[in-house]
Amino acid sequence: MKNRTFITIFLFLILSSFEHVLAGEKIILTALNSMERIGQDQKIDGAHTVKIWSARNEVESFQVVVSAPQENINVIKVEISDLIGPEGSKIEKDDIKLFREEYVRVRISSPRAELPPGLYPDPLVPFINPITGKPIEPITRTQKRWGEPPTTSGYDMYAVPFEVFKGQNQAIWADVYVPKNVPVGIYNGKLRVFAKGGISEQIPIAVTVWDFTLPNGPTHRNHFGSFGNIARYFSIERNSDRFKQIEMRYCEAMSEHRINPPIPRYLLPQSNDDGSLEIIPERHTTLKEFISKLHVTDFEIPRAPFARLPSSTLRPDYKTISPTNRKKAQRYYKEFYKYLKDNGWEEGAYVYMLDEPNLRENYEQAFVLGRLVHEAVPQLKCLVVEQTYLQDPSWPDIDPAVDIWCPLWSFIARETINEKLAHGDEVWSYTALVQRAPRYHPQYQTVKDFDPPYWHIDRPLTVYRVPTWINYQYNITGLLYWSTVTTVIEPWSNPAFAHPRHYNGGGFLFYPGVPCGIDGPVISMRIKNLRDGMEDYEYFMILERLSDKKTVKKIIDAIAPDWWNFSKTPNEFLAARERIAQQILKLKKVDES
């Protein structure tokens, strides 16, 4: 009897192994980090175990590529387990989000593109609709009776099922949120892929949780534009109830990626004709909830409606504000700042005063507007999107009017930035289109032929992660981007901003969820890497508090010494990040002892 039982178990193990080999021949799962992209026909070089490392209150991502080496497969389900850690502690599967990577076409290359035209994974189609909490159903058409009109249900874009043809790949993206209260240690689980024909394959997952915690909101200041353009993508009227619902979902998506969302105007105090503010209780309550829930750390005060200067500087009144309007505007700024101070929001307050003043007359306008704000509220900061040196030495110096300078990456000059910082100003940085250093750059001859990390689909994903590293090098404390939802040719098939040249993904980080049946955004791989860069900055600041800037910069030097020299190798970023984490852990132990 014992021998028969042993033989039965032995045969079962052999058959199980045989089935696994057969499945393994039909499905191969390969792990990639969040900075890699795999083409549909590209040969894969990756691991067969997922290994990631994370602080608490951080989201860390990985990719699993599903490949079909021998025959076409039809994947019908992907599931992930809880991750089990020390003494039975868990990172629950509810804290893990899965997405299927959709491919978009780059038809015409961006200027100075680093990668060729073709298909690139970028939109992340969620397995679960974040609004309904249910899977996105594939589109189907049914007809109850011949001759009757068909009934359509489901959507064109969904996560599963999906086909993988022989020799091709399909990547799955996973976001793992590590809660604040989990014990440190290694958490193990698995991701399993099921295909038709009764075949499946799994890949082990190991998440190492480090003993430090990231703050809720972004330390690195930022401004990423407004969401007015989503009305176009969803074919709705601005300020309609549906628009407000969708706008709020975009705001939530920004917050989830450590970007301060634009505060909807309908939540702000109402401006009266005399410049005074009316605090509407319902708005105020909702605004408090918005700031708390979305971890908002900056507050842009809208420009006073009474102090708008003409965009055309050919008009004789291009820099004139009447005494009456000046008085109203100053009352507006005083009352708005008091409102923020009364609620503890004044620390991150600023006025986005002027964008790219490219004429002498624009400099004069900046001076007039800044003086008006500072006379009303000396401590209220004025932001101007401009480099930290004059375009022309004959132009007026706007330094007294500006508190936050925001140069293009290629316009940055370290020496002049240090001068502004020494005077008590802040410096942010921003990118747009493809612009090299201007002729009036102090080191033009040295940097004129160099390129900073432009933001487009046809470039390595690392260009979205590295700016916060370089910003830290220069003591730059903020990041600005002109839009995340600009008008593109066609968002899902040709996401290019034409100006008139193609800027693939320029000003466009969120895909409209319409083809997925989502009344909100579909996230891009690019914004995930931007989030990782914002999280990296939190590491920098934690280490700086435990040691000093020099210690942090020594590690960053290996990745990004300046705006024209920076790594594009994912493993170099991960190695530097781990060095920072190990330094934090070492110094934290010393600090606690």
Regions found by a protein language model. Give the residues of each.
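Bacterial N-terminal signal peptides
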Residues: T8-S17
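Sec/Tat signal peptide C-region and signal peptidase I cleavage site
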Residues: F18-A23
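Beta-sheet-dominated interaction scaffolds and their linkers
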Residues: G24-P69
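Short strand-edge motifs at loop-to-beta-strand transitions and within beta-strands
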Residues: H48-V50, E60-F62, D94, V160, ...
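Aromatic-lined carbohydrate-binding surfaces of glycoside hydrolases
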Residues: S67, S81-I84, I108, R112-P116, ...
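Short, hydrophobic/aromatic beta-strand segments
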Residues: N72-I80, G185
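Substrate-binding groove of N-acetylhexosamine-processing glycoside hydrolases
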Residues: K338-M353, V368-S593
